[in-house]
């Protein structure tokens, strides 16, 4: 009796899945008239027009300014007085340095 019940359940599941798949397939007959009246070039122009219209609506809240121009950008670092390789600029005198000019710069001095 349980084997017959399992077969009926399997048949019912198979029937439901089959009906679902058949029902889910699209019927392209509905799109036949719409596709015939426009060429691919016209479809591309229509898509481009819709994208421009959407872009205009997206920027309307900011007075037409694109969002990338409204982003806050980090300011650049202030100019440093140190030159490369740990040397100072010409305005610093040799007497102001804490060590002799010929001394080798340490690891921390090269940052």
Curated annotation (Swiss-Prot):
Keyword Signal: yes
Propeptide: 25-76, 88-111
Signal peptide: 1-24
Any one GO CC term of the record: extracellular region
Tissue: Expressed throughout the central nervous system (at protein level).
Residues carrying Phenylalanine amide: 85
Domain of life assignment: Eukaryota
Main location: secreted
A GO biological process held by the record: neuropeptide signaling pathway
Subcellular location: Secreted
This protein's UniProt keywords: Amidation, Neuropeptide, Secreted, Signal
Ubl conjugation listed as a keyword: no
Its job: Plays a role in controlling food intake and regulating body size.
Similarity remark: Belongs to the NPY family.
Name of the protein in its database record: Short neuropeptide F
Organism this protein belongs to: Camponotus floridanus
